[in-house]
Amino acid sequence: MSKQLEKIKQLIEKREQARLGGGEKAIQKQHDRGKYTARERVEMLLDEGSFEEYDMFKEHRCHNFGMEKKQFLGDGVVAGSGTIDGRLVFIFAQDFTVHAGSLSETMSQKICKVMDMAMKMGAPLIGINDSGGARIQEGINALAGYAEIFERNILASGVIPQISGIFGPCAGGAVYSPALTDFTLMMENTSYMFLTGPKVVKTVTGEDIDQEHLGGASVHATKSGVTHFTAATEEEGIQMLKTLLSYIPSNNMETAPVKPCTDPINRMEDSLNEIIPENPNEAYDMYKVIAAITDNGEFFEVQPKFAKNIIVGFARFNGQSVGIVANQPACYAGVLDVNASRKGARFVRFCDAFNSPIVSLVDVPGFLPGTGQEYNAVILHGAQLLYAYGEATVPKITVTLRKSYGGSHIVMGSKQLHTDLNYAWPSAEIAVMGASGAAAVLYAKEAKAKKEAGEDVKAFIAEKEDEYNELFANPYQAAKYGYIDDVIEPRNTRFRICRGLAQLATKRDSLPAKKHGNIPM
């Protein structure tokens, strides 16, 4: 065999060695946990044959605690580029079979390389996390490695989409990188995220809690809002990541892919003419409205299990990807609170950063009252949603279905926040407050006098409520002053949104020159 062929054989052997990660036994352990390896995940996510791997032969440089004898090619992370549905993406996947996926200086360098390239190429970045944390043997170098990654997360924010998949443990400082990305997906039962683990919590606070209840997927999907999606299986999780990518652009200079539309834009949905209940305090399901107006009724929801009183997610109108923000009357009457405001604000800001038009479906009676809300800074969080809508320069269309009261009316894409098109259904009630509250305030003195005179106060207040409703509980007062562009028939909503988006396709808007705003935090 010639020297050249011998070298090629050596290359092939090294590649095979690198592909084994921590070895066959470690791979089997990973499979026994019900988890795929880093390479298997990358192969599932990317188009077949498209993966271009970087730094396959890179090794760590640590000589402490006998680490020089524990070398594995690639050092615990698979990194490179590939395509998903033909679109370029950059990806890294931590390999739990190598030193439990712990982050070393070398791993950080590999991750930072694909992050830098993603920025240069204007392509989405996907990180699959499955790591025991920092590699303790490397000391401060491991911490510096995390910091290098975080800095790039920050610089890439608003420039390229960043998506994190939590497919195993993610603890300590490692949690900050997913927190800095745009979307996070967690695997149910096999992944968790927390700053301090159960043992530390027990030692410091005396609280006895397991990993799942401290930082499992269910906790972060329903209570903290840290994760945007959860999946029961890794196959399902991979498919969700692919679906998400189909709705968003590759970078902040582009728009999302337009899909062929087979659903007529002028399709009338007669059911919408009767979806609003006669009783103004009766709930209805906003999901039915969304399904009735979007292309083929499809909707990809973001954070479906968190703050259910507001709905956010992606849909298409005439093939164009759009962000939807909608109050949900079937949950807490659709009121805004701390979590709903936070959820809505983050989504609106993502849409604005990546050129996704925003369609708002409004039925909101106000902000949730109470000390629990005030003590948890509902003022600041409500201001975040207000700020997000106000700074957004993408096309914005608001449709008011029923209630739109007080400060919540302003916050939910009002005309004064430079919303381009504001429509209202005939059932819309745009006012400072509802009739019962308004009558109680406006006629307090008269009601008191009638009570002292022994007259029927309830009948008096009911009469005044009817008068208030006649005057304000309709869209025409707002339309009279130009705060509503048109009152539309509910069944015609899809067509009006599609036509409005086409009209706004060439919109150009700008903000005053500044380094950056100071959003209420």
Where are these regions (language model features)?
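Ligand-binding clefts of soluble mixed alpha/beta catalytic domains
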Residues: M1-M521
